[in-house]
């Protein structure tokens, strides 16, 4: 790592702490040449291959997950912080798997699990895009499963 101020390569770590809100390690560093101090965050790199519907493999991209969550939760009570928290939870679930290969179907099911707990409108919006309903009957099944005992919610 280079100092962002003078590009010198010799740094010393002054302080190191867990940053639990972002599953990262926060480090305070000092450049040994210019004595400037700065903060860095270290996170685990997720090396998971995603199997796409067409059979291709692609590296997992958290930004795609966050964008999908944002689209589903637009104009709902889910805020940016909760979107990030859900994405972080899903990422942790993926890291916990033994297999470093996951299908888009498995990722979609994880998203649905977390959105169902967070906000029903976001859950249904995501389900409409993710499940690619062919008719209204399929949508009705999701709507009925989203409410307790299939009852109407007001």
From Swiss-Prot:
Similarity comment text for this entry: Belongs to the NrdR family.
NCBIfam families linked to this entry: transcriptional regulator NrdR (TIGR00244)
Zinc finger (unnamed): 3-34
Residue ranges occupied by any ATP-cone domain in the UniProt entry: 48-138
Cofactors that this protein relies on: Zn(2+)
Bilayer-spanning residue ranges: none
InterPro entries: ATP-cone_dom, NrdR-like_N, RNR_NrdR-like
Name of this chain's protein: Transcriptional repressor NrdR
Cofactor binding: number and manner: Binds 1 zinc ion.
GO molecular-function terms, A-Z: ATP binding; double-stranded DNA binding; zinc ion binding
PANTHER family attached to this UniProt entry: TRANSCRIPTIONAL REPRESSOR NRDR (PTHR30455:SF2)
Function, in words: Negatively regulates transcription of bacterial ribonucleotide reductase nrd genes and operons by binding to NrdR-boxes.
Keyword Protein transport: no
Protein keywords: ATP-binding, DNA-binding, Metal-binding, Nucleotide-binding, Repressor, Transcription, Transcription regulation, Zinc, Zinc-finger
GO process terms (BP): negative regulation of DNA-templated transcription
Coiled coil: none
Name of one Pfam family that matches: Zn_ribbon_NrdR
